[in-house]
Amino acid sequence: MDQWDWEKIIRPDQRNYTYLKTVVRAVYLAVRRIAAQVTKKYPALTFDLPREITFVSTKELEKMYPALTPRERENAFTKTYRAVFVYQIGWPLANKQPHDGRAADYDDWKLNGDILLWHEPLDCALEISSMGIRVNAAVLEKQLRQKKELDKLSKP
């Protein structure tokens, strides 16, 4: 697996869900364009990607599939919608557990998520991107408090 990170400087007024959705849609459009180029060059390779990506929060997934594990929820939803952005990963859900573990000092757990695509040959959702808007000072402290890692505030 190859993992590439990129950062984008944003204004404080862009720290919101609307802006995050705009970036997710742009990333997904790039994926669709690349898939089309691959299929054009290699016709045997086809991709069943919907025109639009579907957004779902971890809370919504938990309400829809309360008896399933987080991974099973992602698979069930992604199998139906094919391209999904699961957002708000990190805070505990109604069952008192987070959907998935996230570092407290990286992304804002209210403004993060994973792009998942359904992969028919493996019959499962594949995560192609994990992304989010970085923490600010207030969010950093709140998330460190949640994970009982406030000592990190005193470390450079």
Question: Where do the protein language model's features map onto the residues?
Answer:
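A translation/RNA-centric and nucleic-acid-associated enzymatic feature enriched
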Residues: 61-156
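Low-complexity, flexible helical/coil segments
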Residues: 19-22, 40-45, 120-124, 152-155
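Long, well-ordered alpha-helical scaffolding segments within enzyme catalytic domains
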Residues: 18-35
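Residue-level marker of positions within ordered structural domains that often coincide
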Residues: 11, 32, 91
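Residues forming anionic-ligand binding surfaces in small-molecule and nucleic-acid pockets
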Residues: 1-11
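Alpha-helical scaffold segments that mediate packing/assembly in large oligomeric complexes
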Residues: 32-68
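Inter-helical turn/loop segments and adjacent helix faces that build the functional surface
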Residues: 10-18
